[in-house]
Amino acid sequence: MKIIVSILVLASLLLISSSLASATISDAFGSGAVAPAPQSKDGPALEKWCGQKCEGRCKEAGMKDRCLKYCGICCKDCQCVPSGTYGNKHECACYRDKLSSKGTPKCP
């Protein structure tokens, strides 16, 4: 009986470790990576890029105009926008760390 329990525990540990390893490998090869900003640091290319990224980020926002405004400000400063409509701020540290004067997150 002890042998069977030991084998089951060992098998479950192997499954868990292999799933963690595959998740780490997929993240390392850019499956959830943020697209880099254009080479031009200023001007219309950056504004167009930020506009497209912020449209995607704010498409489900309740106050879309406010979301687009603050996302645009953060994008121009940080030159990145996290993927998805919510969360994923770990992809862009500058975007994540920007705070309003009240100490709340500035970037949507």
UniProtKB/Swiss-Prot annotation:
Post-translational modification (record): Six disulfide bonds may be present.
Predominant place of localization: secreted
GO CC term (a single one): extracellular region
GO biological process, one term: gibberellic acid mediated signaling pathway
Pfam family, one: GASA
Compartments in which it is found: Secreted
InterPro entries with a match to the protein in the record: GASA
Signal peptide: 1-23
Keywords of this entry: Disulfide bond, Gibberellin signaling pathway, Secreted, Signal
Family of this protein: Belongs to the GASA family.
Function summary: Gibberellin-regulated protein that may function in hormonal controlled steps of development such as seed germination, flowering and seed maturation.
PANTHER family noted in UniProt: EXTENSIN, PROLINE-RICH PROTEIN, GIBBERELLIN-REGULATED PROTEIN 7
Protein's name according to its UniProt entry: Gibberellin-regulated protein 7
Primary gene name: GASA7
